[in-house]
Regions:
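Active-site-proximal helices and loops of the catalytic beta/alpha 8
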Residues: 2-276
Length: 276
């Protein structure tokens, strides 16, 4: 913190005990307790040393992968939590090319969405049994646009290995190399800027009839249109955007809004960011 760090990720956080967990009798006799998280987040000092800055001024989240009997709400008293189940649901939708294939309108977590860390895939889903490694970069990117355009959740972008492909998941596989170029794809840059511009604006999510196109609107201020199919789609669907013509800055495509209906064409596996 003295050198400028303003946040922490606690790996495998769910394997570190909470105050409600059982305590070894020897620890009890010595006056100890399950106080790791109280110390780590500055609630309790140890040998008169405590966190340099208040925890609520930092971004702290724990890798608490979801499973049965995980006390998520107790962990959330100390930190934000990973929404691993939501990532699974999103990948299911992307692989099905259909918004209605699963329930993206539900965060699948017991903690409020503003306390969640989201992802399309993580290092675990990419590396462990290659659960998500077979998905194309285009699919992952459209999933990212969806997450980043949303009002809640703090999305994380997993940077796949440089030189990787769907035939060679590991790519160059050199220690210290940065990931591939997807993190600076124009669609990723556009939605990242959109996210900052839309901070605090309420969201509404729509999908067209066959679920191939998802729209995330942020009040009357902006909208993200995402084609999760591999084919061009012509849309006519509800929106909260005011009447007018809007041009996407990445593809230079124009969409028209009249009487609460947005119309236009989207290329396969592509996204369009519109701002008022």
């Amino acid at each position: 913190l003295a050198n400028g760090a303003r946040g922490f990720r606690y790996d495998t956080a769910k394997h570190i005990g909470l105050p409600s967990d059982p305590i070894d009798s020897a620890v009890v006799k010595a006056g100890g307790s399950n106080d790791f998280w109280d110390i780590a987040t500055g609630r309790k000092a140890i040998r008169d040393i405590s966190l340099l800055l208040p925890a609520d001024s930092l971004f702290i989240y724990g890798e608490v992968l979801q499973d049965r009997n995980i006390p998520e709400k107790e962990y959330a008293e100390y930190m934000d939590l990973t929404a691993s189940n939501y990532g699974h649901v999103l990948r299911n939708v992307l692989n099905s090319h259909n918004y209605y294939a699963d329930s993206l309108d539900n965060w699948h977590h017991s903690v409020s969405p503003e306390r969640l860390v989201t992802w399309v895939e993580s290092h675990d889903t990419y590396c462990n049994d290659n659960e998500s490694a077979g998905m194309t970069d285009d699919q992952i990117r459209q999933g990212w646009v969806f997450l980043a355009a949303r009002q809640n959740g703090t999305p994380l972008f997993f940077s796949r290995p440089m030189g990787s492909s769907r035939e060679n998941f590991w790519g160059n596989n050199r220690l210290g190399d940065r990931g591939n170029d997807e993190f600076k794809h124009p669609e990723v840059i556009a939605v990242n800027k959109f996210r900052r511009a839309m901070s605090g604006k309420p969201e509404t999510i729509y999908a067209n009839t066959d679920g191939s196109v998802i729209e995330v609107t942020r009040g009357a201020s902006g909208a993200a249109l995402i084609n999760i199919s591999e084919h061009e789609q012509e849309i006519s669907m509800p929106t909260t955007m005011p009447d007018g013509n809007y041009t996407d800055g990445v593809h230079n495509a124009t969409f028209n809004v009249t009487d609460g209906i947005i119309r236009g064409r989207l290329s396969g596996m592509s996204s369009y960011i519109l701002m008022n």
